[in-house]
Amino acid sequence: MSDYKSTLNLPETGFPMRGDLAKREPGMLARWTDDDLYGIIRAAKKGKKTFILHDGPPYANGSIHIGHSVNKILKDIIVKSKGLAGYDSPYVPGWDCHGLPIELKVEQEFGKPGEKFTAAEFRAKCREYAATQVDGQRKDFIRLGVLGDWSHPYLTMDFNTEANIIRALGKIIGNGHLHKGAKPVHWCVDCRSALAEAEVEYYDKTSPSIDVAFNAVDAAAVAAKFGAQNVNGPVSLVIWTTTPWTLPANRAISLHAEIDYVLVQIEGQALIVAKDLLESVMKRINVADYTVLGETKGAQLELMRFTHPFMGFDVPAILGEHVTLDAGTGAVHTAGGHGPDDYTISQKYGLEIANPVGPDGTYLPGTYPGLDGVNVFKANDQIVELLREKGALLNVAKLLHSYPCCWRHKTPIIFRATPQWFVSMDQKGLRAQSLKEIKGVQWIPDWGQARIESMVANRPDWCISRQRTWGVPMSLFVHKETQELHPRTLELMEEVAKRVEQDGIQAWWDLDPRDIMGDDADVYEKVPDTLDVWFDSGSTHSSVVDVRPEFAGHAADMYLEGSDQHRGWFMSSLMISTAMKGKAPYRQVLTHGFTVDGQGRKMSKSIGNTVSPQDVMNKLGADILRLWVASTDYTGEMAVSDEILKRAADAYRRIRNTARFLLANLNGFDPAKDMVKPEEMVVLDRWAVGCAKAAQDDIVKAYEAYDFHEVVQRLMRFCSIEMGSFYLDIIKDRQYTAKADSVARRSCQTALYHISEALVRWIAPILSFTADEVWGYLPGEREKYVFTGEWYDGLFGLADTEAMNDAYWDALLKVRGEVNKVIEQARADKKVGGSLEAAVTLYAEPELAAKLTALGEELRFVLLTSQAKVEDYASAAADAQQSELLKGLKVALAKAEGEKCPRCWHYTTDIGKVAEHAEICGRCVSNVAGDGEKRKFA
């Protein structure tokens, strides 16, 4: 028996079946670095329209976690897809390098500044520490396959950037947005510093919940407001609070003008509470027997005076919109030094903003006998006892509630009025302009707009000063007596900025004011404060984007961060850009959700459910991590676990297998010589190229909409269904058995070539390593890297006017699916071994029958059977099976006639007709020794 194996065109490629990504990716990365791939891309894209995704700087502290990976991978997918869409999209990664977490790390290792070394040495150690952290994180980000200018990232501690941050503040001052005030700010007693809004987290805490009576100075006058005369005992306004420690700073009681208040007689005294809260208050203070003596609106009680229970002075009743009926008594204890609402209303009434608490959270000397030097949280019990002694305590209980805590220390924080510098939201219309700018930005997902609008609408003035060592100095000089800014502030700030540009922020602390202001130094002093780190990162649109040459003066198109950044980086950037330039710093803002485990729980080291990106890359490879990110809907929480990553690895295998099949069957194909013109191609091959065109249209549209899980779904549908279970199955016979350079085979290879050229580009933004690998195995002349090109423009499809158009092949797909069901059943019943052992008869209604007979002899190749014929539906044999999907179709199956051809494995009755090739069928004889078979349709 002759061996005909050598006459077959068997698939062959060096592209490995197994990805072995964890082993192979580092080698590819080394090549990318050696070749300066990022530089090659920039050169290739020079002069194209720009798309700038500005990197929100991660904090230079600790190893990267899964959330960092999600963020950087999403950015990389966008930058690479924009490149393929014809944009020049430079990506400059950045790091946030100043601030408290770095100070704390350096303190832990070396001690506090001033203890063992100077503040200047401390700053040098902070700079050193931040630099090592940047290097560690950079390695991991590069390992993810993220392309960017990693050799020249921006750091907020670069001397240039530090100088430009000072200039940004100068511009804001010049535009009239800065003011000084003793406003209550979030204050961490452990950090001994003000905290930004974004540095506050909420945890459950048990606090004392107390009801306190403030006695009216003129009981009769207050009772008269209720139309009451025969009052027994003192008249008291009742407040409810969970922060007894703030009572020494009380300077008023707030009521709501429109709320109804009642005067209630209980044993020995009369109480004033909100009418709607009367029952709950009486229940709380354990009073069953009471009489309502009268009622009045809050407005009637304005400026009536009440005696502070223990401070020895009296306070007014004032009116505020912040008073609600949600809880308490309807009367709010008001301490302007300890709360933003209290501060605002106290300002309105011109009340003293008292702050008896020091930076360490203890009462200042002279606060009250026995309280001086006591920690405020420890003082709660003392104050409760004091109120009890004074007869002012109506009730005390414990309340578990959500309480603001420091993001670093996880300890409760306080509101504390300290002299600070603020960016005013309203004195020059910053709030109104910011709200206007928000409307011109595209927010993705769109609920981001309402979220940031409500935050901007309700936020207080932004406290930008900090009492820290490692930060950009405010670089201000104030009059020693009046504390007014120097009249030449902007010039002086520019002078400081120039020095910082040369020597970094230490230049400020080394500066002798005489050097830049002469004799004015006698009456002006340096402001010792540093800037909030959110000012550092929030001004990068100016300190980085406006000055980096690769951005060529273009503003950022997109900011992309986690959804917590509405109140963080998106907010600070919007405030600074609007205050400086009157406009938003971005055109689009995309937010992604947080990572959770497979059960939807927050990642936590204590639960042990964290997924380390380093582990995933070392075990499965970065492309699997990238595929997981792309296939997860980032608009909500993003679940990740070993099981979920295993599913991503399975999907990856399907894509890799498709790519390998394509490459293996392009063996021996030279696109310069072997390409078949579209009009001469087999119809099914043109259909397959059309499928790729439709898929590409969908995929490109999904990339443009940043809908990456849709990209992955469409890619999987193309690989698994349109190609895997239909086209690639059908063409194996023609591909392997036809004459090597026949039109039948070259037509098929032409289709596979076009599909491969398109597919490698579709996967490049997501599966970057795999795309690079595939690219290296594709035939034909090409650029060195897929990343320098654009979407493939060589695809074409079938015209709708053709008889065998897309709709025709869709119908054939369905028929084939129905035939497969019958064959599978026959295999299960042991009637046939494989589909080529089958002969099928399709009983079809006239319209469908016409479609099937149009294929003539080639119908069997589409059905993957050795024989196939079409008969009238009405003449169906009794054993024909009715299709569930297609009403006008019945399928009958029999064993194929004849013998199995050892070369093509089809069953046929013409084996042995040609003496020289007596073992093979007539079709194979033609393909081996004759002109080769002709295929028109499939």
Swiss-Prot record:
Binds 1 zinc ion per subunit. SUPFAM superfamilies: Anticodon-binding domain of a subclass of class I aminoacyl-tRNA synthetases (SSF47323), Nucleotidylyl transferase (SSF52374), ValRS/IleRS/LeuRS editing domain (SSF50677). Its cofactor is Zn(2+). It catalyses: tRNA(Ile) + L-isoleucine + ATP = L-isoleucyl-tRNA(Ile) + AMP + diphosphate. Keywords: Aminoacyl-tRNA synthetase, ATP-binding, Cytoplasm, Ligase, Metal-binding, Nucleotide-binding, Protein biosynthesis, Zinc. GO terms for molecular function: aminoacyl-tRNA deacylase activity; ATP binding; isoleucine-tRNA ligase activity; tRNA binding; zinc ion binding. Zn(2+) binds at residues 901, 904, 921, 924. A motif ('HIGH' region) lies at residues 58-68. Disulfide bonds: none annotated. Monomer. IleRS has two distinct active sites: one for aminoacylation and one for editing. The misactivated valine is translocated from the active site to the editing site, which sterically excludes the correctly activated isoleucine. The single editing site contains two valyl binding pockets, one specific for each substrate (Val-AMP or Val-tRNA(Ile)). This is Isoleucine--tRNA ligase. It comes from Cronobacter sakazakii (strain ATCC BAA-894).
